[in-house]
């Protein structure tokens, strides 16, 4: 089989992708047998192409699954860990903007009773 285009794979359904994956795996098994038995050199070079094709099919399958999950969890309150945005550990533990902006009663009173003085300059 020749190399496949990923944009063609994206148009296929899940069952078609699974079938194509089975075909590629079967072909890879045949090529490996040919390698052991001393097959033609063109078959040996084809192993790399088939392995890449398998990887492409698996990638498209996983991308489709992930996009379907994103759609399913679109308006939910909690998201699975693998769908949350990837951030550093420190950023994930940081206070939210709302939490950081909260003030104590004492701070509020101090600001209310002693506001920042405004000065006007005479010209």
Swiss-Prot record:
One Pfam short name: Ribosomal_L29
SUPFAM superfamilies the UniProt entry points to: Ribosomal protein L29 (L29p) (SSF46561)
Keywords recorded for this protein, A-Z: Ribonucleoprotein, Ribosomal protein
GO MF annotation, one: structural constituent of ribosome
Cross-referenced HAMAP family: Ribosomal_uL29 (MF_00374)
NCBIfam families for this protein: L29
Family: Belongs to the universal ribosomal protein uL29 family.
Protein name, UniProt field: Large ribosomal subunit protein uL29w
Source organism of the structure: Arabidopsis thaliana
Lineage of origin: Eukaryota, Viridiplantae, Streptophyta, Embryophyta, Tracheophyta
């Amino acid at each position: 089989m020749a190399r496949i285009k990923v944009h063609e794979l994206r148009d296929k359904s899940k069952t078609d992708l699974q079938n194509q994956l089975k075909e590629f795996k079967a072909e890879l098994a045949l090529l490996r047998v040919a390698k052991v038995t001393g097959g033609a050199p063109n078959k040996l070079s084809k192993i790399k192409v088939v392995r890449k094709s398998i990887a492409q099919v698996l990638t498209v399958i996983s991308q489709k699954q992930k996009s379907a999950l994103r759609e399913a969890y679109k308006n939910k309150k909690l998201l699975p860990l693998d769908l949350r945005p990837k951030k550093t550990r420190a950023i994930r533990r940081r206070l939210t903007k709302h939490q950081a902006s909260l003030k104590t009663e004492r701070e509020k009173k101090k600001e209310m009773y002693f506001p920042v003085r405004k000065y006007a300059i005479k010209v």
